[in-house]
From Swiss-Prot:
HAMAP family: Ribosomal_bL28 (MF_00373). One of its GO terms (biological process) is translation. GO terms for cellular component: cytosolic large ribosomal subunit. GO terms for molecular function: structural constituent of ribosome. Pfam families: Ribosomal_L28. SUPFAM superfamilies: L28p-like. This is Large ribosomal subunit protein bL28.
């Protein structure tokens, strides 16, 4: 399963670890992803989404119905 937020599209980015001596070693910054079940009242069922913390805040703000309609418009499976 890829580490991509289904709502925001956040994905891992690359950067460097920096030691005290400023040696650079490659690393990945991973998004804060969680599998979360959301109740969809219109469908009378739970929908499981893999979302970041920011994605959960967007769902709280817009509502799950609106977010799911945006996912459908993008052709995203959920």
């Amino acid at each position: 399963m890829s580490r991509v937020c289904q709502v925001t599209g956040k994905r891992p980015v690359t950067g460097n670890n920096r030691s005290h001596a400023l040696n650079a070693t490659k690393r990945r910054f991973l998004p804060n992803l969680h599998s979360h079940r959301f109740w969809v009242e219109s469908e009378k069922r739970f929908v499981t989404l893999r979302v970041s913390a920011k994605g959960m805040r967007i769902i709280d703000k817009k509502g799950i119905e609106t977010v799911l309609s945006e996912l459908r418009a993008r052709g995203e499976k959920y």
